[in-house]
Amino acid sequence: MESFLFTSESVNEGHPDKLCDQISDAILDACLEQDPESKVACETCTKTNMVMVFGEITTKANVDYEQIVRKTCREIGFVSADVGLDADNCKVLVNIEQQSPDIAQGVHGHLTKKPEEVGAGDQGHMFGYATDETPELMPLTHVLATKLGAKLTEVRKNGTCPWLRPDGKTQVTIEYINESGAMVPVRVHTVLISTQHDETVTNDEIAADLKEHVIKPVIPEKYLDEKTIFHLNPSGRFVIGGPHGDAGLTGRKIIIDTYGGWGAHGGGAFSGKDPTKVDRSGAYIVRQAAKSIVASGLARRVIVQVSYAIGVPEPLSVFVDSYGTGKIPDKEILEIVKESFDFRPGMISINLDLKRGGNGRFLKTAAYGHFGRDDADFTWEVVKPLKSNKVQA
């Protein structure tokens, strides 16, 4: 059987784009914690010695935006200009306005509409994906790239590798076999890690530490062999990083946030958006639908699409493709999905409890992926029993 190579990348929490995602979601958390009806569309950008938050927020919450920005930067590890940003001394700019009254009346009637009547906050189409190649029902390339990034941060923060700095990127290439539409990983072909570091460490020390403390604990031994290629800081030097090295912006890592290039993406980012924004809530409900299909045994691999019009509660379309792995025709899987899931934005918010902030709930989603996470706050990862007599017991 012929094999092929597929690659997914990730970035860790100190990447400037991910820093912005986390600030936007920390602000969303703070608003929802005090006022679950908050309407939030919060963007963040950053460059050397500066963070700016801007957008539209209508809330009864009393939120100190500057304090949230500095706290988020500090907790990631941006505590001095040497590492890319000084949380306590950088400039923080805030330009937040209220939600447009035109949008407010069309979507939620200035909070007068019942949940089932709440319209989509904008037009758009979202995709959910699931595959049986990992316990998380996520693509292995994405899972490993994401876990490598998380491990980089762990060994930096716990002091195992004190030379590490916050910024970093990972990439994993895997050799696959297509088994009648299902994806079967054979081996890891290439591992790439580029991580920010201090001036004192040598490239040999970097490579040795990354293999021992990052790659070894994350990638199962069965996927590594003598032919596996390792590119460890291949540029040779990565001292300047974070916002000092590159500008950052909310919503620029949407493939990392989802499925690592597998499935499809409608283009809408997640972070800084309350659940009336179907870019987020729509993507969450179709992930739950896709995961539930695979977990129930109806298919080994599946993609689900939903689409919306602004101000309209009911979706315009729902689509299912099982890539030929379905135990029953896709048309029948689609009917089961439509019967089992309520795609109206107001009902998604209720059924997935998306108006609940606090506990760093959405902040947690903003680094290391929104899907495939084992965390009670990730309610869309709960497999839902499907309404059909064709589902495996």
Curated annotation (Swiss-Prot):
Tissue distribution:
Detected in trichomes (at the protein level).
Q: How is the cofactor bound?
A: Binds 2 divalent ions per subunit. The metal ions interact primarily with the substrate. Can utilize magnesium, manganese or cobalt (in vitro). Binds 1 potassium ion per subunit. The potassium ion interacts primarily with the substrate.
Conditions for induction: Induced by cold.
Q: Which GO terms describe its biological process?
A: lignin biosynthetic process; methionine metabolic process; one-carbon metabolic process; response to cold; S-adenosylmethionine biosynthetic process
Question: So which cofactors does this thing need?
Answer: Mn(2+); Mg(2+); Co(2+); K(+)
Q: Where ATP is bound, by residue?
A: H15, D167, G168, K169, S235, G236, R237, F238, D246, R252, K253, A269, K273, K277
The record's InterPro entries line, in alphabetical order, gives: ADOMET_SYNTHASE_CS, S-AdoMet_synt_C, S-AdoMet_synt_central, S-AdoMet_synt_N, S-AdoMet_synthetase, S-AdoMet_synthetase_sfam
UniProt keyword annotation of Magnesium present: yes
Catalytic activity reported: L-methionine + ATP + H2O = S-adenosyl-L-methionine + phosphate + diphosphate
- Functional description taken from the UniProt entry: Catalyzes the formation of S-adenosylmethionine from methionine and ATP. The reaction comprises two steps that are both catalyzed by the same enzyme: formation of S-adenosylmethionine (AdoMet) and triphosphate, and subsequent hydrolysis of the triphosphate.
Q: Which family does it belong to?
A: Belongs to the AdoMet synthase family.
**What PANTHER family does this protein's entry cite?**
S-ADENOSYLMETHIONINE SYNTHETASE
Name assigned to this protein: S-adenosylmethionine synthase 4
What organism is recorded for this protein?
A: Arabidopsis thaliana (Mouse-ear cress)
Name of the gene: METK4
